[in-house]
């Protein structure tokens, strides 16, 4: 008798520990759903479900263990009923049951489910016993086939989404050509130093060729300017003034006009 009592106490301690773990997991999961719903991800939710499933399987193994006595054969009798508030019961039930009176005992110590639930359980048990092994095997195969088709569709959708993202992110330029173009524009890398045809060899710094090309600046042509043009302009102005002075009836103009050459090149020294 003492051995059975010790075995029952050990079984109850194991069940209480397993149920406490399940309760803590449920509390944590509900807290996440209520307070962290905006940051939750599907992997986190699936991890929580997997944890709860594993804990329920462990509890089921404890109940089905051969060393676990059949709890349905045990009779629970309340030793003390009181309408007054009991602090010890409040602590054990975490504030859920403040009073252990005649009103709450039938609900908390009930060992049988509701009549509707009990009837449904009997119906399911009867259907399970009438099912043959061949029919059960066919149902299992059909279920496995449906799961395989579902997994194939999910994999196909994932592949199509990955291909779509790759098409969108495909490069429309050649990085090598882009780098070469930037290096040529910024540093002159890869550019050939060719001279136009008909031009002489290398010249000393500060000298220009016959074609008026500035050394080191290909494509920039210097406009040749000489002092003879200024002299010609001065002579032309002097001739105009002399002709005006020689004409009868006209007074010579005392206004001096300085005409600058409009073709003066800004780089002319």
Swiss-Prot record:
The keyword Transcription applies. GO terms for molecular function: RNA polymerase II cis-regulatory region sequence-specific DNA binding; transcription coregulator activity. InterPro entries: Mediatior_Med8_fun/met. Residues 190-269 are annotated as: Disordered. One of its GO terms (cellular component) is core mediator complex. One of its GO terms (biological process) is regulation of transcription by RNA polymerase II. Residues 1-26, 134-160 form a coiled coil. Residues 221-235 have a biased composition (Low complexity). Pathway: Protein modification; protein ubiquitination. Keywords: Activator, Coiled coil, Nucleus, Transcription, Transcription regulation, Ubl conjugation pathway. The keyword NAD does not apply. It is found in: Nucleus. Pfam families: Med8. Belongs to the Mediator complex subunit 8 family. Component of the Mediator complex. May be part of a multisubunit E3 ubiquitin-protein ligase complex. Component of the Mediator complex, a coactivator involved in the regulated transcription of nearly all RNA polymerase II-dependent genes. Mediator functions as a bridge to convey information from gene-specific regulatory proteins to the basal RNA polymerase II transcription machinery. Mediator is recruited to promoters by direct interactions with regulatory proteins and serves as a scaffold for the assembly of a functional preinitiation complex with RNA polymerase II and the general transcription factors. This is Mediator of RNA polymerase II transcription subunit 8-B. It comes from Xenopus laevis (African clawed frog). The lineage of its organism: Eukaryota, Metazoa, Chordata, Craniata, Vertebrata.
């Amino acid at each position: 008798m003492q051995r059975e009592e010790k075995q029952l106490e050990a079984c109850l301690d194991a069940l209480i520990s397993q149920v406490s773990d399940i309760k803590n997991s449920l509390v944590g999961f509900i807290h996440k759903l209520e307070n962290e719903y905006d940051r939750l991800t599907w992997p986190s939710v699936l991890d929580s479900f997997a944890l709860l499933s594993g804990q329920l399987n462990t509890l089921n193994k404890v109940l089905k263990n051969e060393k676990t006595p059949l709890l349905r054969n045990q009779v629970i009798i309340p030793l003390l009923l009181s309408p007054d508030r009991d602090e010890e019961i409040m602590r054990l039930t975490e504030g859920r049951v403040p009073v252990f009176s005649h009103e709450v005992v039938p609900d908390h110590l009930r060992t049988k489910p509701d009549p509707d639930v009990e009837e449904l359980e009997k119906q399911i048990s009867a259907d399970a016993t009438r099912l043959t092994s061949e029919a059960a095997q066919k149902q299992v195969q059909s279920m496995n086939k449906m799961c395989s088709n579902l997994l194939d569709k999910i994999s196909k959708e994932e592949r199509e989404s990955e291909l779509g993202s790759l098409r969108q992110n495909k490069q429309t330029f050649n990085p090598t050509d882009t780098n070469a173009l930037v290096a040529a524009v910024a540093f002159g890398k890869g550019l050939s130093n060719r001279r136009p045809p008909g031009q002489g060899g290398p010249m000393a710094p500060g000298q220009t060729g016959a074609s008026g090309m500035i050394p080191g600046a290909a494509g920039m042509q210097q406009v040749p300017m000489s002092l003879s043009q200024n002299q010609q302009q001065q002579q032309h102005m002097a001739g105009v003034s002399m002709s005006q002075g020689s004409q009868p009836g006209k007074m010579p103009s005392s206004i001096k006009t300085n005409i600058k050459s409009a073709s003066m090149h800004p780089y002319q020294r």
